[in-house]
Every structure is written in C-alpha cells, then in structure tokens.
C-alpha cells in the first residue's frame, strides 16, 4: 500500500499548493508562485534578509520582549518568508535547510495566535516530532518564547517515562498544558485511552515531518491522532529534506497548503560550512580522529557512527585518551539520554559521539565541527548530520571518513544530490579562521 492510499484525503480541488519564493519580496509572496526557471520548473531563490526585524511581524509585545531577551535581531530567510503567512492561520508546508530557525517559526506563530487567557484544561496546540530529545528541545523553545506569557502551560510527552505521570498531569485542569509537545507513540496512547482530548485543538504541527511520515508505525500514529482533532485547524509541517513523494503525503493532511521551499532542492548546502572528506582504511580511523581532535580548534564537536556498539566503544576510547566525551544513542535509558544531551548543550562536555538519533533537529549552538567517523548510508542523512555544525548562519566544519567502496558511492551521491564538490581534507590542515567565528 502506498503512503497516499492509507492517509486521510481531501478533494483534489482543495489540494492546490501555493508556493512562495524565499526572496523577501512581499509582492511576489502575495502572488503565491515562485518564478519558473528556463526549464519551466518553479524554484525559490536564496537571498539573505538583513533589513527586516521581528517587530515588523506585528507580534505580541510579550513575544517581542522574549525575542529581544534571546538576543535575536533579524529573522532568517525561512522566518522572514514563513512567519507572516503562519500567523494568519494558513496551513504551511516548509522545507528549509538545517540551522535557519524553523522551530521558531511555528513556536512564534502558534503563540501569537493563542488567546491572552487560554482556557484551563484545554490543549490548543499539538507539536509532534520523531525523537524524545527533539521533543524536549521544542518544549524548551516554547518556554523560552513564552517567558512573558505566564498563563501559558507547556507539557512534553514521550515514551520511556512513566505514563502515570502524564495521566496525572492531564487529569488536573490546573496542570493540564495548553501546548502539547511529544512523540507520536506516547501521544497516540494518551489520546486512545482518552487521557488527552484534542476536540478543541487549533494548531497541528509536525517537525521533521518526513521522518515520521516515512515510517509506517509513526505515520499510523500520526494519522490516528489527526483523526481525533477538529476538521478546522491550522496544520504546519517542517523539515530540512522533503522529497516529492513525501510532499504529496504531507499535503494529504492539509487544506490548500502554502508551500514554502527556502532554497531549491538541488542547493541544500549549508552556507558557511566547510566540508571535506578523508580517505583512509578502517583501521586508521582512530588515529586520524585523535589527530584531528588534537589539532583542530573547536568549541564543541559531534562525531557520528553507524551503531550503538561503535558509539559506546568510541566514546570509551576517547575518554581513555583524555578527551572530554559523552555518548548519545538509543541504547541508553531515556532519563540518562536527556541528562547527557542537556550536559552537552550546557557545555559541560565538548565532544559527543552519537548515532543518527542526534542527526535531526537537535540544536546545540556551540557545535562548530561535525565528523562522520562512519559515513551515512544516504545523502539526506549526510545533510542532517553535518547540519549540526554551522547552525543559524554561523561558520562550521565537517569531515567525513571514507574507508570503503560503499562510502565512496555515498560521497558521490552526496555531491550529485546537492550539486556540490566536497574536496579532500588537506594534509597540512586548514586555517581555523575558515570555520571559527570571531
């Protein structure tokens, strides 16, 4: 059965996308279509936004104060294009490369539309993502931007924690969150058992939507939850990578969605990120990694491996070599995983060894070096991994170890997928000025 066949469908007339170019041109945005290129295909363009401030979005004073407190001055490309549309209540399907602040788009847009005095015991916003760590991070983003909205309550729900605590929280009007953040499995269980009621939901958001809708189990959970929500609501979906097939799946959940693609699909490059590869034998990886960590200047570094076993072993080896390392993978208990993620984010450790569980959406501002100790198996996974460095327009460095013919094939696929050439890392290294912000 295809993705489309088992999803809620709307009539063909309702699924007419409006595509907005990412060029900051309000008139073009109102026209709703990206200009076609010579081949007749509609594409967006990548243009930096420096003149517009968050105040121009006419956000609530409480949100503007929170934005100022966070130190943000100018919206990124994706924020500039998407926030004005999202706060009007339009359904939104947005693809934008890693590090451009997609989370802030739906956080600000939904908070802007909330009542000043939200009704106690009623959930009006639901945000789902595919990992517990990302759910935890999104919850924190809501708390950060809602700091001057004292009546707003945010709750996070995910598997691996006692469901009794969730039920207790939801059973009391005084503690029941207005904003529900979580993973599909736990949210669906709470909805199915009638502990969480979504009859008054106004906003339905999926972050890293392709990851959830591409996995049958998660997709089934998402659909079951969707059926428990009102027909009239705002639906927003975000990801750094959206294939044409997944776009079609996403739009099955939407009515007349506004499609926003910041940068066209062939240019999902990360501006400011220096990318290299190192060709070596498998047995040479540890020595080369040691050399890089000794010689590179970095704030924090994330190292990706292919399995939980390799993650544990490499973390142990690094600590034996006196490198301040921690490991994050699915084999670690939930509470310990959150604890390690928090410690890394708070700069208590400078090196994190991880599987792909850390490869999507997780935002640690100080990471400026990403190393693929093991190459990913797909080009899109590469984008999400190296996107951990050079977040939000800052500089960064990625180095990928290529040790087999399969690795070489993936490297070639990455270069073809993103129309980019990744050079070999110079034997004498590179200047830290090329990947370190002043």
From Swiss-Prot:
Belongs to the DEAD box helicase family. DECD subfamily. Residues 1-16 have a biased composition (Acidic residues). InterPro entries: DEAD/DEAH_box_helicase_dom, Helicase_ATP-bd, Helicase_C-like, P-loop_NTPase, RNA_helicase_DEAD_Q_motif. This is ATP-dependent RNA helicase SUB2. It comes from the Eukaryota. The Q motif is unique to and characteristic of the DEAD box family of RNA helicases and controls ATP binding and hydrolysis. Its EC number is 3.6.4.13. Residues 83-260 form the Helicase ATP-binding domain. A motif (DEAD box) lies at residues 207-210. Keywords: ATP-binding, Helicase, Hydrolase, mRNA processing, mRNA splicing, mRNA transport, Nucleotide-binding, Nucleus, RNA-binding, Spliceosome, Transport. Residues 288-433 form the Helicase C-terminal domain. One of its GO terms (cellular component) is spliceosomal complex. GO terms for molecular function: ATP binding; ATP hydrolysis activity; mRNA binding; RNA helicase activity. ATP-binding RNA helicase involved in transcription elongation and required for the export of mRNA out of the nucleus. SUB2 also plays a role in pre-mRNA splicing and spliceosome assembly. May be involved in rDNA and telomeric silencing, and maintenance of genome integrity. Its main location: nucleus. It catalyses: ATP + H2O = ADP + phosphate + H(+). The keyword Cell cycle does not apply.
């Amino acid at each position: 059965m295809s993705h489309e066949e088992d999803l809620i469908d709307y009539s063909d007339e309702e699924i007419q996308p409006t595509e907005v170019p990412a060029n900051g041109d309000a008139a073009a945005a109102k026209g709703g279509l990206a200009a076609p290129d010579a081949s007749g295909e509609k594409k967006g363009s990548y243009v930096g936004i420096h003149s517009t401030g968050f105040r121009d979005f006419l956000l609530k004073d409480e949100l503007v104060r929170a934005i100022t407190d966070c130190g943000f001055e100018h919206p990124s490309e994706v924020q500039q294009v998407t926030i004005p549309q999202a706060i009007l209540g339009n359904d939104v399907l947005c693809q934008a490369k890693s590090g451009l602040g997609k989370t802030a788009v739906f956080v600000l847009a939904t908070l802007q539309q909330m009542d000043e005095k939200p009704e106690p015991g009623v959930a009006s916003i639901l945000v789902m993502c595919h990992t517990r760590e990302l759910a935890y991070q999104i919850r924190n983003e809501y708390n950060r931007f809602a700091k001057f909205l004292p009546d707003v309550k945010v709750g996070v729900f995910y598997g691996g924690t006692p469901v009794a605590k969730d039920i207790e929280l939801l059973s009391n009007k005084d503690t029941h969150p207005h904003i529900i953040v979580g993973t599909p499995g736990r949210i669906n269980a709470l909805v199915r058992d009638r502990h969480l009621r979504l009859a008054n939901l106004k906003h339905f958001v999926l972050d890293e939507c392709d990851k959830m809708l591409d996995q049958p189990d998660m997709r089934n959970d998402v659909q079951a939850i969707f059926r428990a929500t009102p027909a009239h609501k705002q639906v927003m979906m975000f990801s750094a990578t959206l294939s044409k097939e997944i776009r079609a799946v996403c739009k099955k959940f939407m009515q007349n969605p506004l499609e926003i693609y910041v940068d066209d699909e062939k240019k999902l490059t990360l501006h400011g990120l220096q990318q290299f590869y190192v060709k070596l034998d498998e047995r040479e990886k540890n020595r080369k990694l040691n050399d890089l960590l000794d010689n590179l200047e970095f704030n924090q570094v994330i190292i990706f491996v292919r399995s939980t076993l390799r993650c544990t072993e490499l973390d142990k080896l690094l600590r034996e070599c006196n490198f301040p390392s921690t490991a994050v993978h699915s084999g670690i208990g939930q509470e310990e995983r959150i604890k390690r993620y928090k410690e890394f984010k708070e700069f208590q450790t400078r090196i994190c060894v991880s599987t792909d569980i850390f490869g999507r959406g997780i935002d640690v501002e100080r990471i400026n070096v990403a190393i693929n100790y093991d190459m990913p198996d797909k080009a899109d996974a590469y984008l999400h991994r190296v996107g951990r460095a050079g977040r939000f327009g800052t500089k960064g460095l990625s180095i990928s170890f290529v040790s087999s013919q399969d690795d070489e094939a993936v490297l070639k696929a990455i270069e073809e997928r993103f129309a980019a050439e990744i050079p070999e890392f110079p034997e004498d290294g590179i200047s830290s000025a090329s990947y370190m912000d002043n």
